[in-house]
Amino acid sequence: MQVLQYAPLDLVTHLRDKPSTVDKPIMRPWMSDVFDVAYVPDPAIRRDRLVSPAWQANADGLTGIAPALVVTCEFDRLRAEGIRYAEALRTAGALVEHQDVPATDHGYNILGFGTRALTERTYRLIADHVRTAMTG
């Protein structure tokens, strides 16, 4: 079972090229330089479909991949790539659920930008899907 909560799924495209719909998004372009290098130091490897499954055609042909829950945030710069990956998973028959958390940005659950109830609801959703995957 894949659980992807506001995951970086395209490390090829720099964060400055990923739009946000809010004036002051949590994810700033400089963060791409820090996190992308920390995750995968070699830029050439970032093109690998296992590293950037939402980049270009990397999400094509996902048949047989593990089932997935994808959680995106409405204002997150990573939202579009999460949606692209969720759509590819749906095409492959592997999307269990895509939850787009409304009126939230990246890190809402740990930075205090979402309500406690919203965070708890998302965590319950994740726990329920993992429990179902483990117990059938």
Kindly give the residue locations of the regions a language model identified.
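Alpha/beta-hydrolase superfamily serine-hydrolase fold, recognizing
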Residues: M1-G136
